[in-house]
Amino acid sequence: MASVIFHAFHQIAEKGSMKLFRSHRPEYVDGGQMRDFVYVKDVIEVCMFLMHHRKNSGIYNLGSGTARSFLDLANATFNAMGKEPSIEFVDTPADIRDKYQYFTEANMSKLKSIGYDKAFHTLEEGVGDYGTNYLLPGAKCY
């Protein structure tokens, strides 16, 4: 499955705008639904750490440890593309609306307790790196 950023880059490149789900809960603004976005390069770093610290094998939560909104992700994507944000909010499909998670955030305490202390990329850093190096036409890995 392709990342939200991958889809966003392509939507913006093709249409000049992107779509996000409208909120169906009063405590969240449209696009205010939150996820713990983590950059794949950070996941690789953690995997490498765990490979070298085998005595600490087990099941670990993995994320940045900080929930950010889809609106933040959209703005970071537009910024990485050098474009002004243009976001269209659409209804969450009825068949998933009641099950849709509005907030997820990884508890990173177990990983930190075994000595992992490397900083994770911010959302803006991860989106910028991914877009610049992998998604934009002319990127070194395009």
Q: Which residues are covered by each model-predicted region?
A:
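C-terminal substrate-binding subdomain of Rossmann-fold SDR/epimerase-dehydratase oxidoreductases
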Residues: 12-142
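Flexible, glycine-rich beta-alpha linker
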Residues: 1-6, 28
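Short amphipathic alpha-helices and their capping/turn segments at secondary-structure boundaries
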Residues: 6-12
